[in-house]
Design a protein with these regions (language model features):
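Extracytoplasmic
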Residues: 181, 262, 323, 465-608
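Membrane-interface coil-to-helix junctions
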Residues: 21-118, 146-151, 157-163, 270, ...
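Membrane-lumen/periplasm interface segments of specific transmembrane helices
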Residues: 199, 233-265, 273-274, 279-289
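Hydrophobic/aromatic-rich transmembrane helices and adjacent perimembrane loops
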Residues: 309-312, 396, 400-441
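Hydrophobic alpha-helical membrane-interfacial segments at the cytosolic entry of transmembrane helices
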Residues: 13-23, 190-191, 223-248, 263-268, ...
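Membrane-embedded helix bundles of polyisoprenyl
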Residues: 21-26, 110-219, 231, 235-246, ...
């Protein structure tokens, strides 16, 4: 009976780690919880793309479609799905939800599950090295709501929201170090694969962080054991078996196309050291003041990728852990992971608050010597031709950072938003802060041994207060949401003869909304998902559409199989833009107005 009581008590802690994030998440996205099948977090941004991905995977499973080719967008050319992350760790795992309840419900379920599972992963990991359940629970909640996680919630990017596999992988490695059983290494390999299948960024993150963590955590005695290398190979085989089939189409796409980013462009998505100490501008108490008075916060208005605030209490706790914890191998391992996150998030070049590379003037003679030596030409493809020429003409040099060494490598060079590495810093600092709290509790118990019960009670209270303060530092106002439902015009299109659809005005928002609308009306689209690597046909077709009502442009549009053109009077679209497209269609003899459906006007191209 006593054993059963302990077992039930232990299960309660696991349930708390999984369930407590939900009431904390509710204030951030109340509309999503209330309208679960029709609303998704964030404005109409990349979130719609990943709702489409959830739908597409369901269609692949239900109808046997090609996972990496969609013939119904950019019709009749089709869309190479390798232009976007398929995030199989979400789209495949939640495919049953998609098939039963639709892609919006599946997307929302994946988002909410990421907070619950990140909390649970942190709970397991921290409990593995502290053996304190309340402390592990507090670390789990803090780890689930770090600024990186909530910032991407506001941005709607599902691959980056999916952070849970990182702490779960580190937990499996930690358990292997302690138990030295091959099963934990196999589990680590599987979880590593799920990281890659959630986001290719996560693959790169853990390719750097996991070996560093394990090598410093395990120490030489374990690394010298023959059995370890056999176990490690098992883990690698499992990871490769999961990742390689999904990665091959992307690797082939990288060979066909140049998907590398210039360092000057990557700098726009990098941060400088001050950003790690800059609170978020969406905090309910001091956010407005930070936005107005902190120069390092100005870019947060347009770029949530710069929200990398480490948290003052978390940093303080991590410093205590580094100094006081007796688990020196663990502190070194966590410190290394945090350092990888910080250094990599700063990108290949030192940047100012706006993401502009910091340059220093040098004598003209030095510039000429570097030019004669061919060094400027050597870095032209890396920095970008225009930026290199600017440096040459102004006789200035950039300040390279350690990540510049990695940014030359093939896969690393295709990573644009390097500030995403900050998730490693967040999770490692949370682990170090837990070690700091553990060290303080141990010291208190040693000093006041006679008052053990009182020390335990005070320690529990201190952990709860510290967790609340850390969460409050990271807190933000509710996230904007987007309603996705069948519009009257979609109902009309669903009952029309087959023909491709174009939705105007041109722009990312309208184009994304049209992608979801296609799931409702089922007609093909002449345009489609934008993505980080838009297919060449996207730019070509947009250029043709800009020439309407030119007769040659109309003929070109007809060759795409277009029969329906919509003008969406979406909030935020300027009156002059709407007038421009109205005039274009009214002056097209081939176009006939079919009707107005709420705020959307529909035209039929009879002349094609």
């Amino acid at each position: 009976m006593e054993r059963l009581r302990h077992l039930l008590a232990d299960k309660v802690w696991h349930l708390l780690a999984l369930l407590l994030p939900l009431p904390l998440l509710y204030p951030l996205i109340p509309a999503v919880f209330q309208q679960f099948s029709t609303r998704i977090p964030s404005g109409p941004t990349d979130n719609i793309a990943y709702v489409w991905v959830m739908h597409w995977l369901g269609k692949v499973l239900a109808q046997g479609a090609d996972l990496f080719y969609d013939p119904s967008t950019y019709y009749p050319v089709g869309y190479p799905v390798t232009a976007i992350e398929t995030t199989l760790a979400n789209s495949l795992l939640f495919a049953p939800v998609t098939l039963l309840f639709g892609p919006v419900v599946a997307y929302n379920t994946a988002v909410i599950a990421s907070f619950a599972l990140t909390s649970y992963g942190m709970f397991l990991w921290v409990h593995a090295f502290t053996r304190r359940r309340l402390l592990a629970l507090a670390a789990g909640l803090v780890g689930a709501f770090v600024p990186y996680h909530t910032a991407y919630l506001s941005g709607g990017q599902l691959p980056q929201i999916t952070t849970q596999w990182i702490p779960l992988t580190l937990f499996a490695l930690e358990r292997y170090v302690r138990a030295r059983r091959w099963g934990w290494m196999v589990l680590a390999g599987g979880l590593f694969g799920l990281n890659a299948l959630s986001s290719w960024y996560n693959l790169v993150f853990l390719t750097l962080a996991a070996p560093a963590y394990f090598a410093l955590r395990a120490g030489r005695p374990l690394l010298r054991r023959r059995a370890f290398w056999g176990h490690a190979m098992l883990g690698v085989v499992v990871a490769v078996a999961l990742v390689l089939p999904a990665a091959l189409p992307y690797l082939r796409a990288n060979q066909r196309e140049n998907r590398s980013w210039h360092a000057r462009f990557v700098a726009l998505y990098s941060v400088n050291p001050l950003h790690f100490f800059t609170p978020g501008i969406r905090h309910p108490v001091w956010g407005a003041s930070v936005a107005q008075n902190w120069p390092t916060a100005q870019q947060q208005v347009r770029n949530y990728l710069r929200v990398v605030f480490a948290g003052y209490l978390t940093v303080l706790g991590a410093a205590v852990g580094l100094v006081l914890s007796r688990q020196r191998r663990l502190t070194r391992a966590l410190g290394a992971v945090a350092a990888i996150g910080v250094i990599s998030a700063m990108g290949p070049l030192l940047v100012d608050n706006n993401g502009t590379p910091v340059t220093v003037p040098v004598p003209q003679e030095l510039t000429e010597q570097l030019n004669r030596a061919g060094l400027l030409n050597a870095v032209k493809d890396w920095l970008g031709p225009d930026f290199t020429e600017q440096l040459r003409s102004e006789s200035r040099l950039v300040i390279p950072l350690p990540y510049a060494l990695a940014s030359w490598l093939p896969i690393f060079s295709s990573l644009r938003a390097v500030s995403r590495y900050s998730i490693l810093m967040h999770l490692a600092l949370t682990g170090l802060a837990a070690l700091g709290a553990d060290a303080l509790i141990r010291r208190a118990r040693q000093r006041w041994q006679a008052a053990g019960a009182r020390v335990s009670a005070l320690s529990a209270a201190a952990i709860c207060v510290a967790a609340c303060v850390a969460l409050f530092e990271f807190w933000m106002l509710p996230v904007r949401t987007t309603e996705l439902r069948r519009r009257p015009v979609d109902e009309w299109l669903a009952n029309q003869p087959f023909g491709a659809v174009i939705e105007l005005p041109l722009g990312k928002v309208i184009q994304r909304l049209s992608v979801y609308a296609q799931l409702e009306h089922r007609q093909p689209l002449a345009l489609g998902l934008w993505g980080s690597f838009p297919p060449p046909v996207d730019g070509e077709r947009r250029a043709v559409l800009e020439r309407l009502p030119d007769a040659d442009a109309v003929k070109e549009v007809c060759t795409w199989g277009v029969r329906y053109i919509l003008i969406n009077n979406y909030p935020g679209v300027s009156a002059s833009t709407l007038e421009r497209w109205h005039n274009a269609l009214e002056n097209m003899p081939a176009a006939r107005k079919a009707g107005t459906f709420d705020t959307i006007e529909a035209y039929i191209l009879d002349g094609c």
